[in-house]
């Protein structure tokens, strides 16, 4: 079962197979020194104390030197076994985490709507560690402990032949299988509790991630006590589940030891009844103990396998998730892109909830198209289909007449720049954050993009200029500054298609004015989709698509739509009233 379940992942040991083999080899040396060496020494050393005919001179020195020799072999073999296994284990853990992370990078956005960030972090960091333990430490134990057991049993067979105590030896060996009985009974319980504990660990990570990502909101709404209670409840639930796992895990060793004690006592009773010599009794009891010790450790291995199996189930959920936005088998090459986008009878749904229903539209090259409508009408979904964040259920989306599913995702997305409503910056320098759209850009190119985005002046005002660290998610910059860096990214990419997800909706008037000026420059000579929440954003749009209930119910200029479309008129008038009351630009409700 172990090989069948974990076998496919042993390939991760291939780059460190030499170190892994060395570790196993030294483990066998340590096992042989423990399983047969110690009982053998005891058999010959007991007569030194009990016999009148004691060895003398060199014979005594050689006999006594066997003690440090056996312990040296055992200790050195154990150390080198542990070192090489740790080396192989860390390499496997590194590769496992990279493998899972790489898979996550290629999963569609829909996957992240169904799985929270904290749980995914737990799978990448925690569950990979459990799998690494199974692949390295378990295999090590499955080689080393049986070798100790076989060595000890081999010594018992040797004594059986040399001392003619076949009956006693059979009785002694018959007690060994009794130690295996608790392993299976407890293993099933550990598997169940481990699955629950690992799932709860993911939930705890999610609570922590949400809290740390919403520090301002927690303070602003006095949610500290609520958040402490949430975190405490999650920690306590994990504690209860982990405690149950530990209870079953740690129960196994005492049960095996108790069984061992009864078995040794029974064997000693039989030995006394048969008048077996003290040195033989001592060596037999030592050999029997060396049999029970690996059985106890193998019981622990069984528990480790159960825990790793629960982790493997969670990892394979990620690894075996199908990419619902697959690459084309033979992608067509992209040449000079003009930017013509066509939606042909497109239908799309989120979990059977229709978001777009048989939508058809044509966007000419270099046109700026504003997408307006009530919340949930389909504006964002429409824009997200262009870079293939999702795939249509029915119909097609074409770029310059080519179905975008026939293009490689990398080629398609290289032609599209995106400026989001809340632009995320990475914890790096300003220059490197702008370079995300063109990693090999020179500093002069970065500065030129920043100038076009009206960002150069405020960047130069920082002491470190373009080498200024922005902090986690850009926390050291204002909202307007973050947005202008995101716009600079888009300028640097210089893509023929740009998607603007209302980048001015949460800004003050001054920041909005600067960003509007930058966006006007960004829209020139490009095909632009503007997801509009503020009607001030669409002043320069060539056409406006009005969405309602997953359909485009009208399209035209502002003047045409205001006169002919009741929904558009209602949305605009509602924002106009808001503008009059707040002395600001209209914002969509």
Where are these regions (language model features)?
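An intracellular "coupling" helix at the cytosolic face of ABC transporter transmembrane type-1 domains
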Residues: 14-18, 109-110, 126-135, 139, ...
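Transmembrane helix-loop-helix hairpins at lipid-water interfaces of multipass membrane proteins
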Residues: 2, 20-80, 84, 157-170, ...
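ABC-type nucleotide-binding domain
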Residues: 335-589
